[in-house]
Amino acid sequence: MSLDELKLLEGQLLIPLEMYLAAGIRIGTKMKSKFMEPFIYSARPDGLYLLDVKKTDERIRIAAKMIARYDPSKFVVVSGRQYGHRPVRKFCGLVGCKPMLGRVLPGTFTNPALSHFTEADLMMVTDPRVDEQAVVEAGTMGIPVIALCDTDSPISNVDLIIPTNNRGRKALALIFWLLAREVLRIRGDIPPNGELPVPLSDFEARILTTGEVV
């Protein structure tokens, strides 16, 4: 899908096309998995694969409807990626779900005897490779998994793929901001055309002068 073809989608997407492009949503890696091929439309001259923005938009709609059906207190969002910590916290604060940031300890979702055991009916991960422990345990327990998947992501035990750049600060911020908006609209927490009470910029991870990510 060329840029000219993408421009024809204006008015059909949840947000203006420019917002998706500015956030780098479609920028993948130089590797691809056969499972992600249906979501890839081309490759740049530098070898980076590009994801289909229309399919990303479609999957966000599906994910929002799926999330809205679940009790938010039993919905866990996992992010081992530092750049995902802030957007996940913001998303969970608005939606009412549980953030799980950093490394997931073995048995978190499978062993009720552990002090850190967490019961979940639905899980979302920012990267199925980085968050593999959580995804594997979700598969064992029959917990549906929504995953942000890049061009080279593994999809074992993933029930719903959202194709996106899952490494960039702006991309992660936009995905969680948009998903929060759609969930709240579907649940009736904000009007059908309402906006979130916080701006997109609040979802983006920040790098301090010390190098710390917050």
Swiss-Prot record:
Entry coiled-coil feature ranges: none
One Pfam family, short name: Ribosomal_S2
A single cellular component GO annotation: small ribosomal subunit
Any one Gene Ontology molecular-function term assigned to this protein's record: structural constituent of ribosome
Entry keywords, A to Z: Ribonucleoprotein, Ribosomal protein
A biological process from GO: translation
UniProt keyword annotation of Ligase present: no
Cross-referenced SUPFAM superfamilies: Ribosomal protein S2
Top-level taxon of the source organism: Archaea
InterPro entries named among the record's database cross-references: Ribosomal_uS2, Ribosomal_uS2_arc, Ribosomal_uS2_euk/arc, Ribosomal_uS2_flav_dom_sf
Family indicated by similarity: Belongs to the universal ribosomal protein uS2 family.
The protein's name in its UniProt record: Small ribosomal subunit protein uS2
